Amino acid sequence: LAVFRPSENRWYVQSSSSGKVRTFDLGSAGTDLLLPADYTGDGKADAAVYRNGVWHLIDSDTGEHESFESGFDDGRPVPADLDRDGRIEFAVFRKGTWYVYDGSSLVSHKFGLEDDHPLGPVPVRASLPGR
């Protein structure tokens, strides 16, 4: 289980096996999109946010913070396991082109029209009223 507390810009994550709660800071309320998913392929969700074309990730096992660019300010993040290997790829849709970073390289693929909206997981803004 996990929650993001906007007033503190802090994540609270409870281990399903031990019940222990871990906290860490990642993201900014109102500006970042929260995109937790299993980016490392270990079967556990990693905390991730997308801000202005930059992904920020905290590995659920190591606690290490990684940041990298794989999109554009006006791109829409659509993380998904596109190659079905058990790891979520960092994908961004922008003006009819998909940009996918698989952990080692960034590839692009033209699919869709400039005004299309990508289908996939819905990113959540960190500024949810009353939560």
Enumerate the predicted regions with their spans.
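Trp/Gly-enriched beta-strand/coil motifs that build multi-repeat beta-propeller-like domains
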Residues: L1-R131
